[in-house]
Design a protein with these regions (language model features):
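His/Glu-based metal-binding/catalytic segments typifying zinc-dependent metallopeptidases
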Residues: 25-46, 53-54, 222-280
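N-terminal cap/recognition module
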Residues: 47-50, 64
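N- or domain-start disorder-to-order transition segments that initiate the globular core
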Residues: 1-37
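Charge-rich, well-structured scaffold segments of protease-associated domains
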Residues: 1-2, 20, 31, 75-223, ...
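Active-site SXXK
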Residues: 55-66
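Short acidic/glycine-enriched loop/turn segments that link adjacent beta-strands
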Residues: 13, 36, 94-95, 246, ...
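Residues that act as N-cap/strand-start positions at coil-to-secondary-structure junctions
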Residues: 12-13, 81, 234
Length: 424
């Protein structure tokens, strides 16, 4: 039976109100009175692609709350806990996301702590050494796992091992990370030119003035920070041997384009058909028919300057080659045969429903707003993307697969006990 269609008219997303502060920062507001909570998100272009020393970007972001001019790390944590406030840091290749969430009635005390964290960090030497030692140990343990290693070598195969999106650093580089490295990155990147602020939840004029006053204190730089981005240098196949591994970790994919490309949404549909939900083609094949894996996934991944399609699975070592062959077979089947309308209708509804789930609540809307702002668009693109999803045809899915998923363009990375290259 054909799935009932979920229409774009069911998704209405408010546009953020922009205020430009005297120091040039864009302050975006998404007011909602549904809940007595609010969140402030500061987004800095200060991700790992911008760092001059290995691990400096993540260390700087995570050390912001480890002591300030007027408060110790413990005092910061206790003050936030006392008011039920929440502080979160996320770091990716391009950006650092720093968020403060609180009940509306405790906004004032939370903002005071936010000012200490954002404007007065000390990066204490003893806290830094403890942080580096802990992260070094964690990374050493993680790199014993085939899934961690394949993620790193797949990035290297896509972009090249010197590219900001492909480079990995040895654990020992934590030993040479210094307080001066963090202070230098902080001064260079945590500036007004490098920042935008998004507020969501129950926000009145008083709260908005307080947020604006804090953001206005961020220093200005001579110019916006830039990074060296060489052209990616892809490698078709990478293998790392782990003789004792009982499972192999696999990645298959290719470089494509960023979210602003006209075919990005269509390729999101292609990725979902292949491995974006439990009943996807790769799940039915590798898990359902063959029992090679408990799970396999596919997705389009977007960075600021590049994007790619990736397929990921972990399979038994003895079925590494057969599993890869089935991945290639499913890609080829999508290229060769138009998919059934009923299957595509299900995929459309799953994708539209996921958008609606993400947008359920002020903070989810704020997250999507941030993503759109960083891509140079606004929230109007959400409805447009849903229209694209709902209007795509089996012929269009096949056209995209034919155009972008040629076998000779695919990049494969494997970590495991046996190299399957000559069997695939």
């Amino acid at each position: 039976m054909t799935q009932p269609r979920i229409t774009p008219s069911q998704v209405e997303v408010a546009e953020a109100r922009r205020t430009t502060l005297p120091n040039g920062i864009g302050l975006y507001t998404l007011a909602s009175d549904d809940f007595e909570v609010l969140r402030i998100s500061f987004v800095f272009r200060a991700g790992s692609s911008m760092q001059h020393a290995p691990f400096a970007a993540s260390a700087t972001a995570n050390m912001l709350s480890e002591g300030s001019r007027d408060m110790t790390a413990r005092q910061i944590a206790e003050r936030l806990d006392f008011h039920g406030s929440y502080f979160e840091v996320n770091v990716d290749r391009d950006y650092v996301y720093i968020s403060f969430s609180s009940l509306s009635k405790f906004f004032g005390p939370t903002l005071e702590v936010a000012e200490q964290i954002l404007l007065q960090p000390l990066f204490p030497e003893d806290e830094l050494r403890a942080y580096c030692e802990k992260r070094k140990q964690t990374l050493t343990i993680e790199r014993r796992k085939v899934d961690t290693v394949v993620r790193e070598i797949f990035a290297e195969a896509l972009f090249g091992d010197k590219h900001p999106y492909g480079i990995s650093y040895p654990e020992k580089d934590y030993d040479t990370l210094t307080r001066a490295d963090l202070e230098s990155l902080y001064r260079r990147l945590y500036t007004a030119e490098n920042c935008l602020v998004v507020c969501s939840g129950r926000i009145g004029e008083e709260e908005l003035q307080g947020i604006g006053a804090l953001a206005e204190k961020l220093p200005r730089a001579d110019r916006s920070a830039t990074a060296d981005f060489p052209a990616p240098r892809s490698e078709a196949y990478r293998f790392v041997e782990r003789p004792d591994a009982v499972q192999s970790s696999l990645r298959v994919g290719r470089l494509l384009f960023t979210r602003t490309h006209p075919d990005f949404v269509g390729m999101q549909v292609v990725a979902t058909v292949l491995g974006g939900y439990f009943g996807s083609r790769l799940m039915q094949n590798l898990r359902g028919e063959h029992g090679y894996t408990y799970g396999v996934g596919a997705a389009m991944v977007n960075f600021e300057r590049e994007g790619y399609l990736g397929i990921a699975a972990q399979v038994g070592a003895e079925v590494t080659a057969p599993a890869l062959r089935e991945i290639y077979n499913e890609i080829e089947r999508l290229r060769r045969e138009p998919m059934p309308e009923e299957e595509l209708s299900l995929v459309k509804n799953i994708m539209t429903g996921e958008v609606m789930r993400i947008l359920d609540g002020p903070f989810g809307i704020a997250d999507v707003t941030i993503e759109n702002l960083l891509c140079g668009t606004n929230n109007g693109v959400i409805e447009e993307n849903i229209r694209r999803i709902q209007s795509i045809t089996p012929a269009e899915v096949q056209r995209l697969a034919v155009k972008y998923l040629r076998r000779e363009d695919l990049i494969t990375a494997v970590v495991g006990a046996v190299d399957p290259k000559h069997e695939i």
